[in-house]
Amino acid sequence: MMCLSRYEKATFGAGCFWGVEDAFRKVDGVVSTRVGYMGGHLENPTYEDVCTGLTGHAEVVEVTFDPDVVGYSDLLDVFWSIHDPTTLNRQGPDVGEQYRSVIFYHSDEQRRAAIESRRRLEESGRFRDRIVTAIEPAGTFYEAEEYHQQYLEKNPRRRCYLMRLLSTR
């Protein structure tokens, strides 16, 4: 039985949520993941709504993790490694505000850690272009339709842009 009180949440948008979720599910200490939508103005959006680009929502992954096993800073490292944080509203062939690079923080501690990790990455020189990743307070999480949950596990022959990025690192 899980003791939920000791677990924490982290929410990330880094392009198509299928691949982002798949990457985080492989991290030791991640207890569960859910894909969904956050950061927009429409209540209870559907995938079709979000794909119009008119809702303001990002495709996100809500990560529930055990901080005794994996730290938030470790999750930030995964986040930075699985997408290009210098492309505005785009990851590979996926274009639109819903594919933006964004960290939704759940506490002041997460906000500070996210800002510091972005600063360190900017100073590292790893990316030639400016990092455009937004860091915003977490709002309402709207869970995506069931067929999107653990999509790449259910459909192992499918791939997305993120997976190609991971395979080259």
Swiss-Prot record:
Q: Which family does it belong to?
A: Belongs to the MsrA Met sulfoxide reductase family.
Assigned keywords, A-Z: Oxidoreductase
Q: Which Pfam families match?
A: PMSR
Q: What is this protein called?
A: Peptide methionine sulfoxide reductase MsrA
Q: What does this chain do? A: Has an important function as a repair enzyme for proteins that have been inactivated by oxidation. Catalyzes the reversible oxidation-reduction of methionine sulfoxide in proteins to methionine.
EC identifiers of the protein: 1.8.4.11
One GO term (biological process): protein modification process
User: What are the positions of the active site?
Assistant: 16
Please state what class of enzyme this protein is.
oxidoreductase
Q: What GO molecular functions are on record for this protein?
A: L-methionine:thioredoxin-disulfide S-oxidoreductase activity; peptide-methionine (S)-S-oxide reductase activity
